[in-house]
Amino acid sequence: MREYKLVVLGSGGVGKSALTVQFVQGIFVEKYDPTIEDSYRKQVEVDGQQCMLEILDTAGTEQFTAMRDLYMKNGQGFALVYSITAQSTFNDLQDLREQILRVKDTDDVPMILVGNKCDLEDERVVGKEQGQNLARQWNNCAFLESSAKSKINVNEIFYDLVRQINRKTPVPGKARKKSTCHLL
């Protein structure tokens, strides 16, 4: 079974842990308890293929920056999360993406931009178009708005990253073997 190392990044309080726990355990964590670093494993089926996801739920961008290079180096796919209710969390992601590209030393990194807390429409300050425009600037990066509370696009975030990783590095043994016939 293929393993996938996914990393959830973003500012403090955007809902990184809420999204991760909702995906892995199916529960919504109401209270804010700042994360240092949590790792979760979940087996899922994506496009008929069994996958073991290792999801690293990271500290907010303003804390524990020394650890960040290491999990950027080891991660295969990245969810960059902001809150639609806080402009600063959206603005913080540009530096984060640049850091990932620098550590990975490539522009082709499986990544998804996630506008979280879309259930709080009346508190929205970051428009959906802003997210779509930023995703376009980022080489047509995937983009979703989500809500851990309302279970909107939670699974899709992680499944999309798996699909991106599969496109970038196809599953070994999945391609049809070429058979040859030798006449002697």
From Swiss-Prot:
Stored CDD domains: Rap1 (cd04175)
Lipid group attachment sites (S-geranylgeranyl cysteine): C181
GO cellular component terms listed in the entry, alphabetical order: anchoring junction; cytosol; plasma membrane
Keywords: Cell junction, Cell membrane, Cytoplasm, GTP-binding, Hydrolase, Lipoprotein, Membrane, Methylation, Nucleotide-binding, Prenylation
Keyword Lipoprotein included in the entry's annotation: yes
Listed PROSITE patterns: RAS
Modified positions (Cysteine methyl ester) in chain numbering: C181
Main location as per UniProt: membrane
Transmembrane segments: none
Motif Effector region: positions: 32-40
Name of the top EC class for this enzyme: hydrolase
Molecular function via GO: G protein activity; GDP binding; GTP binding; GTPase activity
Pfam families named in the record: Ras
Subcellular location: Cell membrane; Cytoplasm, Cytosol; Cell junction
InterPro entries for this protein: P-loop_NTPase, Rap1, Small_GTP-bd, Small_GTPase, Small_GTPase_Ras-type
Catalytic activity: GTP + H2O = GDP + phosphate + H(+)
EC number: 3.6.5.2
UniProt propeptide residues: 182-184
Protein family per UniProt: Belongs to the small GTPase superfamily. Ras family.
Function of the protein: Probable GTP-binding protein that possesses GTPase activity. May play a role in endothelial cell polarity and endothelial barrier function.
Protein name, entry field: Ras-related protein Rap-1b
Source organism: Xenopus laevis
Lineage, highest ranks first: Eukaryota, Metazoa, Chordata, Craniata, Vertebrata
Encoding gene per record: rap1b
